Swiss-Prot record:
Protein name, as recorded: Thiamine import ATP-binding protein ThiQ
Primary gene name: thiQ
Binding locations of ATP: G32, A33, S34, G35, A36, G37, K38, S39
GO cellular component: plasma membrane
InterPro entries documented for this protein: AAA+_ATPase (IPR003593), ABC_SmlMolc_Importer (IPR050093), ABC_transporter-like_ATP-bd (IPR003439), ABC_transporter-like_CS (IPR017871), P-loop_NTPase (IPR027417), Thiamine_ABC_ThiQ (IPR005968)
Function: Part of the ABC transporter complex ThiBPQ involved in thiamine import. Responsible for energy coupling to the transport system.
UniProt membrane topology term: Peripheral membrane protein
Source organism per UniProt: Mannheimia succiniciproducens (strain KCTC 0769BP / MBEL55E)
């Protein structure tokens, strides 16, 4: 569950105001022109930006002033932020232990998560040996390994070709079902999400301008 109550953020020359309630396990797309406030909205929810006023509730808890690591949120960007000197398995494991000192049970969990996104055969490879789609699978697996109930995606697949985007969106839908995730995804291709999301929110000039319920 995501609830923003009169959240105000004084962003440079465009003050932002957000009010929204997203139900548990709901899947919502965020659209709008560049600079409208879409990424800032996700950063406020994740805690990378601090609201100047209002409240941010996540899964029934007030997280307005908590640190990003304390919030029940994982976030995936267009830039997958993989470390080229680490293997696929190690890059995924960072989501669990930044020092990579894993127990046998944790190592097993990393491999299970890699398998869930179709990476079992690539665990020993470095990111430089992967395709764009495979790199995003690694980043997605790292997010999932954190086992947070809310997943925020900021145009994560926009650099991929249409066929790969469709493949990743199908995988995302499957994982949301299996893990009962609440999803918020920023996109410039909302038509590709038809049948995969519950509603579309349009952001204009730092506020929600339209709420299109698809179900």
């Amino acid at each position: 569950m995501i609830k923003l109550e009169r959240v105000y953020f004084n962003y440079k020359t465009m003050p932002m105001n957000f009010n929204i309630h997203i139900k548990p396990q709901e899947r919502v797309a965020i659209i709008g022109a560049s600079g409208a406030g879409k990424s800032t909205l996700l950063n406020l929810i994740a805690g990378f930006e601090r609201a100047d006023d209002g409240e941010i509730w996540l899964n029934g808890v007030n997280h307005t002033y908590t640190e990003p690591y304390e919030r029940p949120v994982s976030m995936l960007f267009q830039e997958n932020n993989l470390f080229t000197h680490l293997t696929v398995e190690q890059n995924i494991a960072l989501g669990l232990k930044p020092d990579l000192k894993l127990s046998a049970a944790e190592q097993s969990l990393v491999r299970q998560t890699a398998s869930a996104v179709g990476l079992s055969r690539f665990l020993d490879r470095k990111p430089t040996a992967l395709s764009g789609g495979q790199k995003q699978r690694v980043a997605l697996a790292r997010c999932l390994l954190r086992d947070k109930p809310i997943l925020l995606l900021d145009e994560p697949f926009s650099a991929l070709d249409p066929a790969l985007r469709a493949e990743m969106l199908d995988l995302l839908s499957q994982l949301c079902n299996e893990k009962k995730l609440t999803l918020l995804i920023v996109t410039h291709q909302p038509s590709e999400l038809q049948g995969r999301i519950d509603r579309i929110l349009t952001v204009e000039n730092g506020h929600f301008a339209k709420n299109n319920d698809l179900k």
